[in-house]
Amino acid sequence: MGQEKNMMDSLQLDYRIVDTFEDLQRVAEGFETQRSVAVDLEADSMYHFQERVCLIQMASRNLSVVIDPLKIGDLSPLRSVFENPRIQKIFHGADYDVRSLYRDFSFNINQMFDTQVACRFLGIRQTGLDAVLQERFGIRLDKKYQKKDWSRRPLPPEMIEYAAKDVLYLHPLSKILQAELKEKNRLSWVQEECQSLSRVRPAENGGAPLFLRFKGAGRLNRRHLAILEALLQFRRHIAETLDRPLFKVIGNHALMRIAVEKPASLKDLEDSRALSPGQFRMYGRGIVEAVCRALTAPDAELPVYPRTKTAPVSPEIALRVKALKSRIENLAESLKLDASVLCPRALIGTIATANPVNIRSLKALPDLKNWQRKTFGHEIVTVLNDLKGKNKR
């Protein structure tokens, strides 16, 4: 750790705040000349109905900035930085950030490197940034501001400094991890995984019933399901009106309890004790009205929870799954990786169902990445062909 510690000692927290369009243009031009830029962001999902990106922290090796999108509004100068394939964008745990940057600014990320993904492919078990920095550099991140309201203005200086610190460490961490991946011939694996990750997008409801994303809804009968949907729509309306996150209006447990007990009067609702006194006072009447509407809806209009009919797995496919799983686990153990990193169980099922007979057949499987096909494609084909040979005897 000595060399890594010296690398960290040379780092200094020297950043500036960018809160005007003109300054953002200058910053973007500066980043355009860099080979890599570290990126992190802070959002306000715990304080508002529609979450927003409230800060974007970006750092090259000689420029570190905290960008205020709420003040600037138009972040178009950054588009060329994020979309430039010659500039590597370094994230840690990029999934949420990629979705958020696309949702709020329609940014596409080209040439991304996720240090958390890199950690997984190096066999590191604890991949949170705090754990990785502590293990690598002996640094502990102060997380006391992690759940604060990042939309408040002005932000206290200590919160801005907290935000600036995370990206400070991503460049040296990325350099070390990429060197280790290269030594193990796994850098191309992570690059392909990161390319796939850079294309994730926010989930869209598309007018679908809200109960489809509600845990436990599939266990309800149609009448209870109608009540739950009415309650979810009511909560969503209140949350949007008050600009609060859904969980700060009424929690999921309370809604499920009301849907099952279906109180048709204020007294019934109060007796159920599903709500706090404050919630009952503010939302009780609206909840009872929602319940009553669902209770009086005609049977023909009641929702049906969609059931995905899956064909029973044949004995042949089950044997292939078992054989492939065993081979993948052995390979993962030899590489000191989690088997799910090497080949997720769902992908094993896809391969077993397709039953590819040669490497060319493997190329027809869209979920199988190039690095997987090159690394253990021959083993997959060998396992499956061996099973065929045994079945013919």
Which residues make up each language-model segment?
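Active-site-proximal helix-loop-helix substrate-binding element of RNase H-like nuclease domains
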Residues: S10, I17, Q57, N62-H171, ...
